[in-house]
Each structure stands twice: as C-alpha cells, then as structure tokens.
Amino acid sequence: MNDMPGLALPNASERYLQGIVGRHQWLRDGVMPSPLEFNDFIDHAADLLSDFDTVPAIWGKLSAVLRQRQQATGDTAWHRSLRDHKIAAMLHDEPTTAWSFRKPRGYSGDAHLIDFLYEHPAAAPDLNAASPLGRALNAMVVSSSASVAVQERRRLLASYLDMTAERVPNAEALVLACGHLRELEFTRSADRLVRLMALDQDPVSVAEMRRCYSGLASLCPVEASIGRMIVRPLVHGRFDLIYAAGLYDYLDDTTAERLTLGMLSALKPGGRLLFANFCRDVVDYGYMEAMMDWRLIPRDEPEMQRLVDRLPGADLANITMFRGLNRTVVYVLVEKRG
C-alpha cells in the first residue's frame, strides 16, 4: 500500500526501466557505449527477458541501443556476435522476428510478414503458437514505429483505391508488388473499379490473393516481376491509378528511376501515381537488420525528389510529397497532365 498520498509508486515496468538506466550510466548520459558496455547491456537485457513481464521496459532501450550500434559501426560484424548471444534465441521467440530471419519464402519483407504487422487473422496461428515471451515481444513489434507506418500505409492505399473508384467512371488501377493486397479489406468502393490489376512476383502471394478476394470481379491477379513494367510498361494497358507502396525500399536508384518512368507512361491522362519509401531515421532499423535480417534502402525527401526530377516535366500536372502520420514513410503522389 502507498502510505504517501499523491505519490504514485512506479509500476513493474517502470522499476525495471529505472534499474536498466541505473546500471548503464551511458544510457542516461546519451553517449555511445564501449564494446564492453554494449555487451554488458545485452547480457543484462537477456537476463531480464527471462521474465517476460519486463518486455515493455526493455524493448524501447534495446531498439535504441541496436540502432545506435548500427549507425556507429557501419558494418555487420556486430550482427554475428549478437546472433550468437542467448538473447537472439529469446527474441526469435517472437513470430514476426523468427519469420523474417528464416525467410520461408526466400526473401525479406514477404506478404506473410506484413500480415504479422497488420495483425491480420492469417497470422493468428503463428502468434497463438508462440511462447508467452514471444507474444509479449510481438505486442512491442506490432506497435513499433515501422509497424505503425505499415498499418497506416494499408489504410492510405485503401483510400486511394476508393477515391479513384469514386472520382473516375470505369476506373482502372494497377498495384505493383501487391503482396496479399490486404488493403482491399479496408475499401468501400473497390467493386466500382472496372479493373484492378495486382502484380506480384511471389506465386504464394498471388494464390493467397486469389483465394481471399475471388468475389471481386474486377480483380486481375498476375504473377510477374517489376521488370515487365520497366521493359514493357504498356503491356497491361493504361490506368487511372498506379501505386507501388512497399517496393521502393528494396530498389537501387537506377531501378527506381526506370520503374517510376515506366509507371508514369502507363498512366492515363489525369491519372495518379503513388509510391513510397521508408525514411532514413527510423529507430527500428538496428533491430530489423541485426535480429530480423531485414534490410531496407531508405530515402528521405531529397532522394525521392531526385526520382521525380527524372520524369518528363511535360507529362506532370502536379507533384505532392508528404510523410505519414508518424513521419516514418515518405510518399510521392504524381498527377499526370490531362
């Protein structure tokens, strides 16, 4: 019982956090730890994680420390030592982290991984099979800044599908690297589209999309790589909306430039092109690279502007660049001249 009115006692998570900061002076001072101090922190974090009630206290500090180490070293040697530490097995109890690290589909950021971040029912069996520690860690992963940005992106894409269907008679839309196309579940007007062509190179994703959304008559799932859009951008005709929201994070500048030009050429007059990229300063990157083996090619506004600058100005009616609500993803909306 608290015998001092007006004085709130710290909860368990706050007490753990106070203990972490108290033991590791450099955390409080905001300075770079030495390799010895970093290793001591990882040892301490692993010891605390044996009680999964400590997860909320540890998660934020762990993410920040891994990001700090990533930025300071500029190499991946520290990944190997961290993955050999007992903390790696504990963190891989978290199903999203384990899936990303194992890469069952052979590449990073696959559609089932995104289902984890969406907290979609398709990922529920994996989560239900996780340990208590894994489930506690999952609550942190899905509420991280990168995950929240992905969740917001899903709603944003649904809104652009709706706007296009409501704005343009007989509208046609093209989605590149569509994954499972889960944004369809948030739309209200997708059934008004005459054609919704959804391309993905992963046959498992295309099959899942067909299975889940077979009732949408306008949906045209296609198993294809983005190379088709680069080499033959008009092979599927022209569209009122084209978007590639989760693709640019994996493209080098040359490929991104060529793809952007190809998508613009496949727009109808007055059509809209939306593409997006994770920004550079995201605290989750250290954890993603070290524990999930998931690497992105981040871009801020200047890099995105350079992609836009490669487009023929005569074709452009308007360009809007904006960030998502938590400032983690930058979007570019290009409107083609009518």
Summary of predicted features, one role per range:
Residues 1-126, 134-139, 143-145, 160, ...:
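N-terminal accessory segments
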Residues 179-193:
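Conserved SAM-binding loop of SAM-dependent methyltransferases across substrates and taxa
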Residues 202-204:
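Conserved SAM/SAH-binding beta-strand->alpha-helix loop
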Residues 231-242:
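A short acidic, Gly/Pro-enriched loop at the edge of an enzyme's catalytic core
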Residues 250-263:
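A short, conserved alpha-helix within the catalytic core of class I
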Residues 270-278:
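Conserved beta-strand signature within the Rossmann-like core of class I S-adenosyl-L-methionine
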Residues 278-295:
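Short, glycine-/aromatic-enriched active-site segment of Class I SAM-dependent methyltransferases
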Residues 295-314:
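Short alpha-helix
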